[in-house]
Amino acid sequence: MIAGGETMKRGLRAQAFLPLIVFLLTTTSCTTEKKAERAAPPEQVKASVNWEKVVTLSKTTPTLQVVVNPPLRRGHLTRPLAPSKIHDPVFKALHDLGADFVRYVPWLPYPKLGVAELEPPANGKTSWDFSLIDPMTEDFINATSGHSVVLNFSTIPQWMFKTQKPVPYPADPDQVTWDYEQGTEFRDPSLKEVADYYARLVSWYTKGGFVDEYGHRHESGHHYKIAWWEVLNEVESEHRMTPQTYTRVYDAIVQAVHAVDPQIKFVGMALASEPPDYFEYFLNHQNHKPGIPIDMISYHFYAVPTPDQTQETMQYTYWDQAERFLAVVDYIQAIRSRLSPETQTDTDELGSISGDDLEQDKPGHVTKPIPDSYWTLCGALYAYLYSELAKRGVEVAGESQLVGYPTQYPSVSMVDWNTGQPNARFWVLKLLHDNFGPGDKLVEARVDTPYVYAQAFVTTQGQRKLLLVNKRDRAFEVTIPDSQGSEIRYVDQTTNFQPPGEARLNGNQLTLSGFEVAVVNLSR
């Protein structure tokens, strides 16, 4: 999760980027023959596939995260504003995507939308209140019905931490605050208080309600099936937990939640960075209470250029940082294989952030326009990461995030925050989801330039497909042997806010425009 204020400054060690203001001059035909209309001729490259050489079997699900924020509300309950214009189209897009392992995160900038007990129990009374939390949660669960989800109520009630004075929060649920999370020491060192809080949350959504601290029953009527529960978020930044502290908190919460629903599986850590000591400590079963499962771990990656980079150099930075991240993934997978090989991996925040977003907490900041080419670049980066994570045996590749908007990381959004229309980042995810998934065979593919990425798949239905990703803001003409007449689905700067385009190859060449992602179906 991308944090703000003091938390933002801590959480953006590797989460900064300048917006791409590169207006691409490529257009691509959506007719039967796909062409690039550039002044300069495209570079000629060749792709080859060895269908007999299987590299690995994919375990990887392409998916996304949904972060709670006001535009996702059905309407504004506390002040006379019009209902959200994007609520319906956004949840429809989520429903139509049909992805598994979708991550849902109520989090710190909006305490009233993410914390169910904002005040400590006192004098026989509690402050439990789901009236603002339930509508979005219900809409999310309905939109993802029939699919596995990962719930993460990531923000612990602030009063559970020792602070010099109580930490305030806005009366307006739509008012952002970056200062809610403070303190590093729990007021209850036994951790029973925080564990009971999460047990009651789970009981609210799975058992129809719960009994509070004073023995009073609170009825919800909810009996949802929750497949996965992620325990907190970016804990090395939020409350600055050590691996030892987090492991104790994880164990306490897992034990309490399992008492409510023994079928729930758990995701641990959700790290913003990749500190080796966290993985070494947390994945060692000897550091956990007996019987505590480590079903899955999670961590995040956001591409980050330095502030002084020019617009032209940013496209190179993205891919360089992705390569470094993948090297870290290899290292983490080696630790996991050594200490807890049964544990799965969820990279549940994969994204990129513009440099302008880093200024959003400053008074009077106005979000700069984001060019369409930025969304296609981000989509291409995600497609590349998905494929490479599949090679490495990572189970979940989650794109971040469904809705961002001014004050809440607009450059990370997968939709237009004014209309709810999905952008190229969403449509690339849709393209991958509709063509690839767990059980596919990854087979050897090559292309004679480092600037175009190729990976071949034999799907579970036996179809032969080639994923192509253009890493550069220029066109390449890719020769693919025996591809004449093949169907193509693609996302580029001409499709951008529309569903993937469709075409058919008239010959063995495909012109790949700047930052384009294409899937060529070579099954005939």
Language-model features, listed with the residues they occupy:
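Bacterial N-terminal signal peptides that target proteins for export
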Residues: 8-17
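Non-catalytic accessory regions flanking glycosidase/transglycosidase catalytic cores in CAZymes
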Residues: 30-231, 237-238, 242-275, 288-293, ...
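Histidine-centered active-site microenvironments of extracellular/periplasmic hydrolases
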Residues: 365-368, 372
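Histidine/acidic-residue-rich catalytic or RNA/ligand-binding cores of hydrolases
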Residues: 356-362, 409-414
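Glycoside hydrolase catalytic-domain groove-lining segments
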Residues: 304-361
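Bacterial N-terminal signal peptides
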Residues: 17-27
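Catalytic-core regions of glycoside hydrolase
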Residues: 260, 279-296, 324-339
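Short, Lys/Arg-enriched N-terminal segments with co-localized hydrophobic residues
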Residues: 1-7
